[in-house]
Regions:
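Glycine-rich segments within core transmembrane alpha-helices of 12-TM secondary carriers
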Residues: 137-155, 345-356
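Juxtamembrane intracellular "pre-TM" segments in multi-pass secondary transporters
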Residues: 2-8, 192-219, 406-408
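Conserved MFS/SLC helix-loop-helix module at the cytosolic interface between two early adjacent transmembrane helices
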Residues: 63-99, 273-279
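Helix-loop-helix hairpin linking two adjacent transmembrane segments in secondary transporters
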Residues: 142-187
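Cytoplasmic helix-loop-helix junction between adjacent transmembrane helices
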Residues: 107-147
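Helix-breaking motifs and short loop linkers at transmembrane-helix boundaries and internal kinks
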Residues: 44, 76, 97-103, 245, ...
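Extracytoplasmic gate region of multi-pass secondary transporters
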Residues: 32-33, 214-266, 320, 325, ...
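C-terminal transmembrane helical hairpin of 12-TM major facilitator-type secondary transporters
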Residues: 276-326
Length: 413
């Protein structure tokens, strides 16, 4: 019957909870960025320290995205999802207890471990729960809350709370929702049939995952997108406060454009790529992202800063959703969605979310924070060159071109 062929009720409950969960990952990860100008005064941090604080989480995230993705393909989604969510929520609260750079780096590194394990596992769980016709839509919806919670609501919430409480208590407050959601996920999420007795037959070595041309290209493309957007996300608040001399409220308002633009981009672009094609949308997004990052660097008024940053991040964050969502899923061997996504996300995080902010912090410290925008721009331009070699995999686009449509990579069909 209809219910036996597809459980839509479970699909929407699971996707809703996983969407909220990934939004909280974004909030817990990025709430620190608008707090850094205030924290820097209390903890005596400089731009290099700020870049390192952002980078250490990205490096740990990258390594454990690779490990966690493969682990959840073997032992099950819930055994990775629930402990990871509890851990990163608690560690976000512990960030408020840091009394210096070393303790903050340690807390954020361990937080990156848990968030890295959660990320590809949550994408695979959304993929498991989604009807194939809604897979791209659901993955786009899920990933769109990362910038919405972390980079749109986060700066506004943080800068407004600072009027009443210290930055330490801001971290404590944002940790609570994740603990509640972990309980709801534990009650709701089911394991996919592919984790049963056929698991050992279906799994392939890493070399099999890398055989599809789009996997190594997606790794490079994600590095470029993350190097651009995470450099902006980490250092734009300090650029606005220190270089353009904006106050806390103005800085929070402009910085929120990163999140609102990213939310819309991750919500819209994966679906657009179903029609226009993965390759076309990816290349065009890198080009337009670079154009608007350049425009942001030339802007000085609040309206121009907000508008150019919003549109630039629409394309940049849309790239993150597109590369780690449908492009990764359609390049994955049968039954290895989480593992393949983990490799792509992990490599992108290590270099784009880890190494790039360290370099950006050094650039800001040595040459001036305004030059970090040039670094983001160069990364996006390189992304145009990389994605020009992608192979088209969108089923509707292939059908429109009269090309053969490959069978779905996911083991459930």
């Amino acid at each position: 019957m209809k219910d036996q062929s597809w459980d839509s009720s479970y699909e929407w409950k699971a996707v809703t909870l996983l969407t909220l969960g990934f939004g909280l990952v974004g909030l817990d990860r990025w709430i620190i960025a608008p707090l850094l100008p205030t924290m820097s005064r209390d903890l005596h941090l400089n731009y290099q320290d700020a870049g390192n604080i952002i980078a250490v989480l990205g490096l740990a995230w990258g390594v454990f995205a690779i490990i966690g993705g493969g682990l959840s393909d073997r032992i099950g989604r819930k055994k990775v999802l629930i402990p990871a969510m509890v851990a990163f929520s608690l560690l976000s609260g512990f960030s408020g207890m840091a009394n210096g750079l070393v303790s903050l780096l340690l807390i954020r590194a361990v937080m990156g471990v848990s968030e890295g394990a959660f990320c590809p596992t949550s994408f695979a769980t959304t993929n498991d729960a989604s009807k194939p016709a809604r897979r791209g839509l659901n993955l786009g919806i899920q990933q769109s809350t990362f910038p919405l919670f972390g980079l749109a609501f986060g700066p506004i919430v943080a800068t407004q709370l600072l009027r009443f409480i210290t930055w330490r208590w801001v971290f404590v407050l944002v940790a609570v929702p994740g603990l509640i959601l972990a309980v709801l996920l534990a009650i709701t999420i089911r394991e996919p049939p592919s984790l049963g007795t056929t698991d050992h037959v279906q799994r392939a070595p890493m070399s099999e995952m890398l055989r599809h041309r789009n996997v190594p290209l997606a790794m490079l493309a994600l590095f470029c997108a993350m190097a651009g957007i995470f450099t902006l996300s980490a250092l734009v608040p300090s650029y606005l406060a220190d270089y353009l001399k904006l106050g806390n409220t103005e800085q929070g308002l402009v910085t929120s454009a990163i999140g609102f633009g990213g939310f819309l981009g991750q919500l819209v672009l994966p679906g657009v790529s179903d029609v226009m094609g993965r390759k076309n949308v990816t290349v065009l997004s890198f080009i337009l992202g670079a154009v608007f990052v350049y425009a942001f660097a030339q802007s000085v008024t609040l309206g121009a800063l907000f508008a150019t940053l919003l549109v630039g991040c629409f394309f940049c964050f849309g790239l993150l959703g597109l590369i780690t969502g449908p492009i990764a899923a359609e390049a994955a061997p049968l039954g290895l969605i989480s593992s393949t996504t983990g490799i792509i996300v992990g490599s992108g995080e290590i270099f784009g979310g880890g190494v790039a902010p360290i370099i950006a912090g050094r650039v800001a410290q040595s040459f001036g924070i305004q030059h970090t925008l040039t670094m983001a721009l160069v990364a996006l331009i390189i992304g145009v060159l990389v994605t020009a070699f992608l192979r088209e995999t969108a089923p509707r686009r292939l059908a429109a071109l009269g090309a053969p449509v490959p069978s779905p990579s996911r083991s459930e069909g």
